[in-house]
Amino acid sequence: VCEVHLTGTELGEKSYMQSTLVERGAAYKMLLDGTVQAASTHVPALFLHQDLKECLESIQEKTPKLLQSAQNTKFALDNVRPESSLQNLVSKFCIEPDEIKKSGINFIAAIGSERGWTDAERVLLAEKGFTLCSMGKRVLRTETAATVSASIILSSLGFLD
């Protein structure tokens, strides 16, 4: 995980972006704790955004090629109107783990709040080239969805063998 972008969503709890998780640095502390637990030295960069549009515009402005590159895989978890399962999307990349780094492929995940995306947010994600993917019909907490999706990607690419 290179970057984490926390953003407000249309259906998300409005007070979330003003919570202690965000305002007092608790989110960054969680990233540090996760880095220690993983026995890693890499701490993902943390960015805060008021809404999804601002988030995507910020990423586009900072690293235009990230959202434009066809070799990058962009997906948004959505159990309402998925186009594919996350497993099926990732399974298209049947290359060795060492080749992933050399190829420059990035997986860009958009994980919404427990209440999901609005139709307007789905349209915005589609306009930016995101594929709506499911991990089943059940609603997962955001942090659980993030962990599970990362695990599916890593396992599918052979990083957990």
Indicate residue ranges for each PLM-predicted region.
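RNA substrate-binding interface of SAM-dependent RNA methyltransferases
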Residues: V1-F75
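A mid-sequence, solvent-exposed acidic-amphipathic segment
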Residues: Q50-I100, I105-F107, I111
